[in-house]
């Protein structure tokens, strides 16, 4: 347990940031799962919409520093390849 005031503040900030990052990472996972489910069903129009949604979430999270920009680009590339297989 921190004693110094600044250390206590750092603990509070870390807890807030951890919760915020966890929330965004959960959004990413959810968007990817929804996309993969639609791809598995073979619905092209809905898959395209889910791909756009997932790409948007990945770009936003990379911009906010939650994931690295290269990881976001790699994930988007993987999802696009999956989409192109059914399109």
From Swiss-Prot:
* Gene Ontology MF, one: structural constituent of ribosome
Annotated GO biological processes are: translation
The source's superkingdom equals Bacteria
Question: Is Nucleotide-binding tagged as a keyword?
Answer: no
Q: What does this protein do?
A: Binds directly to 16S ribosomal RNA.
Which PANTHER family does the record match to this protein? 30S RIBOSOMAL PROTEIN S20 (PTHR33398), SMALL RIBOSOMAL SUBUNIT PROTEIN BS20C (PTHR33398:SF1)
- What's the protein called, per UniProt? Small ribosomal subunit protein bS20
Organism from which the protein derives: Halothermothrix orenii (strain H 168 / OCM 544 / DSM 9562)
Gene name for this UniProt entry: rpsT
